C-alpha cells in the first residue's frame, strides 16, 4: 500500500511536486519566517512522536519508559555522538558523487532525472539556517522514529526502508528515490549497530549539512 504514493510519479513521469504548475503555485509566497518554521517543526513533532509511542503500545501495554526503550529512543553516549557526526559528514561526502553517478546512468538510459533547480525551488521557502535546522530535526526525528524506531525491529531492514523511500515519491523522480533508498539502508544498518537516537542524529545532521551547502552555493 505504501507504494501507492508512487502512482502519481509513474502517471506523470516525474515527481508530482516538481510539476511546473504545482511548483509555481507552492512558491508564490515570501520566504518562511522563523516563527512559521518553528511552527512547522512543532506541528510535525506534535503528531509523529505520539504516533510512534501509540504504535509501540503506549499507554495500554507499555509505560513511557518501556515504550521509549522499544523505540530505542535513548540518550546517546559521547562515543555515539561522535560516531553520528562522523557518519553524517561521511554520507555528505559520499552521496554527492554517488548521486552524480546515478544521474549519469539515468541520462544514459534516457530516463527522467530529478531536476536540481526544481528540487531547490520546492524547498526555497526554507533555504536559510533556521530552515536547515528545522528540516534536519523534522525529517531526522520524525522519519527515523517511524521507520527505524517503530517498523524496523518488527519488519527488518528492507520493508521499513521501502516505506521510507516511498515517503519521498512526491518530491523526487526514481533516480532521487534510489538515492533515498541507499541513505535509508545506511540509517537502517546504523540502527542495528546503535539506536534510533543515533539514526535521527545522523539523518538530521545530513539534511542540515546538505541544506547549508545548498545555501552557501
Residue map of PLM features:
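Loop-to-transmembrane boundary segments
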Residues: 1-9
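Juxtamembrane helix-loop-helix connectors linking adjacent transmembrane helices
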Residues: 2, 13-48, 56-138
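Transmembrane helix-loop-helix hairpins at the membrane interface
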Residues: 89-217
